[in-house]
Design a protein with these regions (language model features):
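Conserved, structured C-terminal
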Residues: 597-601, 605-606, 619, 706-708, ...
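Residues forming the flavin
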Residues: 2-597, 747
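A short, contiguous, amphipathic alpha-helix enriched in charged residues
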Residues: 42-52, 662-679, 764-769
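Structural motif
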Residues: 27, 78, 392-394, 614, ...
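Well-ordered mid-protein domain cores that form the structural environment of catalytic cofactors
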Residues: 677-728
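Residues forming anionic-ligand binding surfaces in small-molecule and nucleic-acid pockets
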Residues: 293, 438, 525, 636-652, ...
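Acidic, proline/glycine-enriched N-terminal capping motif
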Residues: 550, 557-690, 695
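Short beta-strand segments
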Residues: 30-32, 280-282, 396-398, 698, ...
């Protein structure tokens, strides 16, 4: 073994790193050096670092196990301060100049973790201990046990600072998506690209080629690494191909949509100006999964010591990165592929201490100078912070500083399960392969499909691409797959060493042992799903990529059945962890929940309005004027001015839905409780819609502007939910109806003009072609109009205040100009602008229901609108609204309340009790929903629900708030405090 500098004692010559670009980095405060093209893991291996972390439960020493994204042990925090990223796999994190990394999940130094005391408590922390321990004494649950468990939970820690990195999102479309750029993926991508199809080739690695980068294969007489880079270069030069390295396709969703995470900046020093990662939504017509396979470990005594690695990972570090995991290496393999590790190490001058193969018979090859033990197994290991010796089942001890383990290969089939697909067991390769339920449009090639030889991968990639092209109508390729080394893939199922006397680890991150699996069987948790949750097998950040099959095999043996009979769990997205920042993209802070501003917002700011958040809207709450001593005085003035003269309020936030089509009237008839089939053109009608369970969903008005044209308004809070509900009805319930919907909430500015002088004010703004007289434009009329000399608009004569009122609408871009024109026209009448507070006061005075009266539990009967329910037609929720429990004679009814002592103030949330009854649930008769001080009446008023409310007008009951020690008498009255006959709004 030759070293390439004293700073990297385990660095070999060769490899695919750029030695012209050395890079300094730190690990746990110690300075090291690597090269461009290294991962953090390969650089640590080159520097002789074996101990990199601690396990989750027992805090046992952990080293690097793999060389890819399946890594369960080497989880580090990369970066510092706000840029720190916990739980980063060292095996995929690219090295860059100045990188800082630190180990995690330990207290005290990594080499002396005080939490390692948990290992001595392992008899009390076995599988399912959390169901059986900490049960007594009860007082300790929250005071002792929970704080103890929570302080011990987790792996890496967040910085506690806002993430300064930028993330982005994007959409891509292609004919063929190739997932994985190994030999099968490169062959599939090239075949598809030559046909003229639009191709996306995505791979999680920064160097495309898959296992070819780590092996000594030849393809068409040239090194596999060279062949791969030639194909990548050829694809990169083609206009119809997008090559995406550093891109993990993490999820397969409906309709050929795939989620992908591209790490565009993780290999560079932190830079807050450029995106760190991009989340892609890829729309593909066909997808070919060429994700390769993952090597499995073998469970044997103390198989978790640092320095024990997968055989393929050892080859990767030696061949790709020129880093030696050890100086004296033993290989423990159950298959022919593992023997190739011995050959590659020997070729690089690394001493082979022994090759151990549990299979009987002759050795597949004779590594130079190595001892061979056929029919034997590694039963145990020694070493504190790294392996120093192995013990064979035959009793022989062999000193080593690295052990390469190969228990066979498991195809990377996770994406095939994301739509409930279930794999099948193949006995010849002792692995699960894709079978039923593969996402539509997906095919699988290469090792991911069980084709473990290089030649089969190349051939399958070509064939699956041709099949996809044929399905899409493209010309298929007549070329044959290139010729390659044809290696043996013979394997004998062998999952754990029964002769081991010490703990044998199955899931190294979550500290699940063979004994834990057997204990789960003993205690009745034998289903694969129960096994997973009882032992936490496969529930770590790696989702059991290296552990699941071993655990399932042990459970199958315990049950006395075969592995396919035992079954397997399936996978769900994401394939590897996706940062929450990437899912959010640019939607952070106010970009996540931006304020929606009304068209009159700038004008309202000029008037000194106080604003309030109403959902995502910023609405003017009230408009204080010089001399106003309090907000109440301002609101009282706005209400009084409106009722005595005229007031204007921006009601743009009300949901507006444009409904058109030949069957629009029938559609409305089916969603509203009252009839809309005979609504005349130029008329507006109040309506209420129910949920399917008969509960009131929303109320509002719908105006008929033309024979097939309607405009619906909804409450501000329910604008989105109602639109989604209507779209569901249109698309799923009645797709045969000719009706089309579009939300126009943001497209129209709308203002309520209310008060006795509202008609006079509008006559100065609305163009004279529109007759605004009571006869020409009566209550509930609507019309398309023009204003201010030809600007198109709409006018509705509806009232939320109980006064003569209109709502005038113009395209949103004219909203600011319209509010200024309205206020200018109203100066001679002493017009006032009013906000949401005055709006709320007037609606309570008039008895209109709003959000507080529509909490999702009330019915039309409760709201006093039972008479609106049409008996001549059906509608959504009609049948269930007739349930006896919803129509009880003693049910809740909406009524008004006023204090017997007019000087007392009411508050929402108070409960009603009969006079003389104790304040308990048994005697509770209802609650107060909305309250306001009425300047028109001079005292506090409220709306609320009380049992048999309609029959109890004038009755005195108690309004009680035990939380604030309030107990006063209130009188039940009509909810219509102002103009109960509705005369004002019809003048």
């Amino acid at each position: 073994m030759s070293s390439n500098g004293s700073r990297q004692p385990n660095r070999l010559s060769g490899g695919l790193v750029d030695r012209r670009r050395p890079m300094d980095f730190t690990f746990n405060g110690n300075r090291f050096q690597g090269y461009q093209g290294d991962t953090v893991a390969s650089a640590l291996v080159a520097n002789g670092v074996k101990l990199v972390g601690r396990s989750f439960k027992y805090h046992r020493p952990r080293g690097i196990l793999t060389a890819g994204s399946e890594e369960p042990n080497a989880l580090l925090t990369i970066g510092r301060d706000a840029y720190a990223e916990p739980n980063t796999r060292a095996t995929v994190a690219e090295l860059y100049e100045g990188l800082t990394a630190k180990s995690q999940n330990h207290r005290g130094p990594l080499g002396f973790d005080v939490m390692a005391a948990n290992d001595f408590l392992s008899p009390f922390l076995s599988a399912g201990f959390y169901y059986k321990t900490f049960m007594w004494p009860r007082a300790f649950w929250e005071k002792v046990y929970e704080p103890l468990i929570r302080s011990s939970a987790g792996l890496g820690a967040l910085s506690g600072q806002p993430d300064p990195s930028k993330y982005d999102k994007g959409f891509l479309h292609c004919d063929v998506l190739v997932i994985g750029a190994g030999p099968a993926g490169l062959m599939a991508a090239k075949t598809a690209a030559l046909s003229g199809a639009r191709v996306i080739l995505a791979d999680e690695d920064f160097r495309l080629g898959g296992r070819l980068n780590s092996e000594t294969y030849e393809i068409d007489g040239k090194p596999g690494q060279t062949w791969a880079q030639e194909i990548v270069h050829e694809l990169s030069e083609m206009d119809n191909v997008r090559v995406m390295p550093r891109t993990t396709v993490y999820g397969a969703y409906d309709h050929g949509i795939y989620g992908a995470l591209e790490r565009v900046g993780d290999h560079l020093p932190p830079n807050g100006d450029k995106p760190r990662q991009v989340l892609w939504r890829i729309y593909s017509k066909r997808a070919i999964l060429c994700a390769g396979a993952i090597e499995r470990p073998i469970a044997f005594g103390d198989n978790d010591r640092p320095g024990i690695m997968l055989a393929s990972a050892v080859r990767s570090y030696v061949n790709r990165w020129g880093a030696a995991p050890g100086k004296r290496v033993a290989i423990f393999t159950t298959n022919d592929d593992g023997w190739r590790t011995a050959a590659d190490l020997a070729a690089r001058g690394i001493e082979i201490a022994a090759v151990i193969d549990p299979r009987k018979g002759d050795a597949p090859q004779k590594p130079h100078g190595a001892q061979v033990f056929m029919g034997d197994a590694v039963a145990g290991t020694y070493g504190r912070k790294g392996i120093t010796q192995i013990s064979l089942a035959s009793g022989r001890d062999i000193p080593v500083d690295c052990l390469a383990v190969s228990g066979g290969w498991s195809p990377n089939l996770q994406l095939t399960c994301h739509q409930r697909g279930r794999p099948a067991w193949r006995e010849d390769i002792a692995a699960f392969v894709p079978d039923q339920g593969i996402p539509p449009g997906m095919s699988v090639a290469g090792a991911a499909n069980g084709g473990l030889s290089l030649q089969s991968a190349l051939t399958e990639g070509l064939n699956k691409a041709n099949t996809a092209l044929q399905d899409l109508g493209f010309k298929t390729s007549p070329q044959a797959a290139p010729k390659s080394d044809d290696e043996s893939t013979a394997v004998t199922p062998f999952f754990y060493v029964k002769e081991s006397t010490s703990r044998a680890w199955v899931d190294q991150q979550n500290d699940v042992t063979v004994k834990d699996v057997k204990l789960a069987h003993q205690e009745g948790f034998r289903s694969v799903e129960h096994l997973k949750r009882y032992t936490t097998l496969g529930m770590a950040t790696d989702q059991g990529k290296t552990a699941n099959v071993v655990g399932l095999a042990i459970m199958a043996e315990q049950r006395g059945i075969s592995i396919p009979e035992a079954g397997t769990t399936i996978f769900r997205p994401p394939y590897t962890p996706v940062p929450i920042g990437a899912l959010a993209g640019r939607a952070r802070g106010k970009d996540f929940r931006p304020y929606r501003l009304t068209p009159s917002h700038a004008w309202a700011e000029e008037q000194g309005a106080t604003f309030v958040e109403v959902g995502m809207w910023m609405r003017a709450q009230y408009f204080p004027k010089p001399g106003d001593k309090s907000w109440r005085e301002t609101v009282d003035r706005e209400v009084s001015t409106t009722r005595n003269s005229v007031g204007i309020c921006d009601v743009t936030t009300l949901g507006k839905i444009d409904i058109q089509g030949r069957d629009a009237a029938e559609f409305l008839n089916r969603v509203y409780i009252n009839g809309f089939a005979k609504l005349a053109v130029g008329k507006t009608r109040y309506g209420m819609m129910l949920r399917e369970d008969g509960i009131a969903m929303d109320d509002g008005t719908t105006a008929r502007l033309g024979e097939t044209h309607y405009v619906m308004t909804t409450t501000t809070a329910n604008a989105g939910p109602v639109f989604r509900h209507l779209e569901f009805c249109r698309q799923c319930l009645w797709p045969d109806l000719d009706v089309h919907l579009i939300s126009t909430t943001d497209g129209w500015a709308q203002f309520a003009v209310a008060g006795p002088n509202s008609r006079k004010l509008l006559q100065k703004v609305v163009d004279p072609e529109t007759d605004l007289s009571n006869e020409g434009f009566p209550f509930m009329a609507c019309s398309e109009i023009t204003v201010c000399g030809g600007t198109p608009g709409r006018l509705f004569r509806i009232s939320f205040s109980g006064e003569l009122a209109y709502e005038i609408a113009v395209p949103a871009r004219y909203g600011d100009a319209l509010i200024r024109a309205l206020m200018k026209a109203g100066e001679e009448f002493g017009v006032t602008a009013y906000g949401t507070e005055a709006l709320g006061v007037m609606r309570i005075e008039k008895g209109h229901a709003a959000g507080a009266e529509l909490p999702g539990t009330t019915t039309a009967q409760d709201l006093g609108m039972g008479g609106m329910v049409s008996k001549k037609k059906d509608c959504i929720g009609n049948t269930l609204s007739e349930r006896p429990e919803l129509n009880r004679e003693d049910g809740l009814r909406l009524v008004g309340f006023r204090p017997v002592d007019r000087g007392q103030q009411l508050k929402a949330g108070w409960h009603f009790l009969p006079k003389g009854a104790p304040a308990d649930m048994t005697h509770d008769e209802g609650w107060m929903t909305s309250v306001a001080f009425s300047p028109s009446l001079g005292h506090s008023i409220g709306l609320g629900f009380i049992k048999r409310g309609g029959e109890r007008m004038g009755e005195i009951v108690r309004a009680v708030s035990p939380a604030t020690n309030v107990d006063i008498e209130v009188e039940i009255v009509s909810p219509h405090f102002i103009d109960p006959e509705g005369e004002r709004l019809r003048v």
